[in-house]
Amino acid sequence: MDYAARKHAAQTRKASDIPYLAHLLAVCAIVMEHTNEEDVWIAALLHDAVEDQGGEATAREIEQLFGQRVADLVRGCSEMTESEHGERPPWLTRKQTYLDSLAHAEPEVLLISAADKLHNARSVLADWLRCGDDAYCKFTAGKRGTHWYYHEIVHRYRLTGKVPELLLREVEETVARFAPERVDSYEAET
């Protein structure tokens, strides 16, 4: 936990002053309800470190400190951090690549991912209940893209058959509260 706290010390939750560590702890707590594997717990605490705090250099550091298994799980939970040209890819490219990766992800990666998406969906729901559609102004893809992504990720989890059913159902029910109608496609606005 100390490593996660240090890595994300300057980071807060999107458009808030909530320390990012709160999200990492929440994801880990959800994961702990579904497995007793310590490596999976550690990976849950570190699931955003590669994506948000240094890319592959951070993955190598995690491997040195916590082992290959933890590093592989964290890599599996991470969106692509750089394109072949060295810059961060556009939102839709990152999301589509991540969604596609779920088809061959191992069950532990899917568990961490679903716990992450559940906590994020709870945050979206709370913001939406508090602010209405203004809550979507902090999201790159706005309301339509956010709804598309959450419905699509639930669909992809279901296709794998590897996400614990109770967890999947909770993600699905939470998403349905702020996005009751499925958005079947999304194209980024240019």
Annotate each predicted stretch with a short phrase:
Residues 1-190:
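Active-site helical microenvironments for divalent-metal-assisted chemistry
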